[in-house]
Regions:
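Beta-strand-rich solenoid/repeat architectures in extracellular/passenger domains
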Residues: 1-2, 20-39, 62-74, 94-118, ...
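Extended alpha-helical scaffolding regions
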Residues: 46, 51-53, 57, 73-100, ...
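Extended assembly/interaction regions that build large supramolecular complexes
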Residues: 161-163
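Small-residue (G/S/T/A) turn/hinge positions that recur once per unit in extracellular repeat modules
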Residues: 11, 25-27, 32-33, 58, ...
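Exposed, low-structure sequence patches enriched in small/polar residues
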Residues: 124, 244-247, 272-279
Length: 281
């Protein structure tokens, strides 16, 4: 396996264009671009720098592209997109990370040859607002899969998973293409150690099939799961569920559908909420 692409940034600078230039490195994927067989397809820092933690903040713009048979597709490291308020320079404004993935495929198939174990497609570590729209996340069984593989793993991170939309003939907006997750232990994870996280996650217009847990939240500050479909059935460990939330004080679940797979264990659940410490909807 090769090392993949590194996108170097500056943790102390924003992601906006300034005087025609960006402070941050940018990786742009389009027109059916493919990155495959990498240890980390896109790593958003310089691990060889004297202080790697100062080189975060790089930007990814990916559309109509594929990440195939990588041990990890994308790894975001801690970064906040901060800048001075234009009218009140004494104030600092925090914006979402401008990185996005639109209509992209993240897949590991039977051709994956290791030797690194596949653990997760995307790692988001202490960032906020990274967007995934109309993306497909897939995993086929192979001997190099970790015992508990994950689609998107957010650690104290904010992110959005959504479908794409178009205008219908009656003037309303309809879903054009949903995001999908298939065959993971946990498809989408939002977690944190210690205090409840402040960054929010949103999952909308997404189909989950053959996952032990579709959405798993632990110590997440605020989460929203809307207009998504969960086919519950796979079992690797414990009781499968479409949504599992623990120590998560605010979780909004609306207009979701839960069904059982044709092959399913005796115990399975649509939603499990444990020790929410607050009122959940």
């Amino acid at each position: 396996m090769w090392q993949g692409i590194q996108v170097w940034g500056n943790r102390n600078k924003h992601q906006l264009k300034e005087n025609g230039h960006y402070w941050q490195g940018i990786a742009e994927l389009k027109n059916n671009a493919v990155i495959e067989n990498a240890k980390v397809a896109i790593d958003l820092w310089n691990p060889s720098a004297a202080s790697p933690e100062l080189t975060t903040g790089g930007i990814v713009r990916a559309s109509n592209s594929s990440f195939i048979n990588n041990a990890r597709a994308v790894h975001f490291h801690p970064y906040e997109n901060r800048f001075q308020h234009p009218q009140h320079p004494e104030q600092t404004v925090v914006r979402d990370n401008v990185s996005y993935f639109h209509n992209c495929t993240f897949a590991v198939n039977s051709d994956y040859s290791g030797p690194d174990a596949f653990i997760s497609h995307v790692n988001l570590f202490k960032v906020r607002g990274v967007r995934f729209t109309a993306c497909d996340f897939r995993l086929e069984d192979n001997p190099f899969n970790h015992q508990w593989p994950i689609g998107i793993h957010g650690y104290d991170a904010g992110f959005i998973v959504d479908g794409s939309y178009n205008m219908l003939s009656n003037g309303t907006v309809g879903v054009n293409k949903k995001s999908t997750f298939d065959n993971f232990f946990k498809a989408v994870v939002s977690t944190k150690d210690g205090l409840v996280g402040e960054r929010t996650f949103t999952v909308k217009a997404t189909n989950f099939t053959n996952n032990q847990y579709g959405v798993s939240a632990h110590l997440s500050g605020y989460g929203t799961v809307l207009n998504s479909n969960f086919e519950v059935g796979q079992r690797r460990y414990g009781c499968p569920a479409g949504i599992y939330a623990e120590l998560t004080p605010q979780l909004t679940i609306e207009q979701d559908t839960f069904t059982m797979a044709q092959v399913h264990p005796e115990e399975y659940y649509g939603v499990i909420i444990k020790d929410s410490k607050s009122v959940n909807q």
